[in-house]
Amino acid sequence: MKAMSLATSGISTSNVAAANSNTSPVNIEVAVRVTGACTYNVEYTLDDIFASTFTQGAATWFNHPTLAAGQTTTKDCQITWPVTGIRINQTAGAGSSATTVLQAGI
C-alpha cells in the first residue's frame, strides 16, 4: 500500500486514511510528527468510510490505546486489528502534526 499522509494545524481533525480491513494479518503503522505545541490523539473507526452517507462528525471514533488523548510529542503506534479508517484529532495548541500511515500486506 502506498503511504498516506495526514495533517492537522491548530485545533482540527485530519482527513481520514482508508485502511483495508480484509487483510490478514492486519499491520498498520501510524507515525505522528509534531511541530510546535499541539495535543493530539490517534483515532480509528469501524464505520464504512466509503458509504455515501459517511461524515466524520457522525462516525464513531475510538482512541488508539497507545496514542490516546493527551499526546504532545512525536510518536508512532501500530494497529493490528481490522479498522476502516484512521485520523488524527488535534485537541489543543497552535502547532501542527504530519502523519504517515502505512499498511503492510497489500
Predicted region positions:
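Short, surface-exposed beta-strand/strand-loop-strand elements in extracellular ectodomains
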Residues: 37-56, 100-105
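Extended, low-complexity, turn-rich repeat/linker tracts enriched in Gly/Pro/Ser/Thr and Asp/Glu
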Residues: 31-40, 92-98
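Beta-sandwich interaction modules
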Residues: 6-23, 60-106
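Surface-exposed loop/edge segments in extracytoplasmic proteins
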Residues: 2-5, 49-64
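Acidic/polar N-terminal loop/beta-strand segments that form early-domain functional surfaces
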Residues: 33, 45-47, 59, 91
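Structural beta-strand segments of beta-rich domains
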Residues: 24-30
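Residues that flank catalytic or metal-binding motifs in active/ligand-binding sites
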Residues: 26, 38, 84
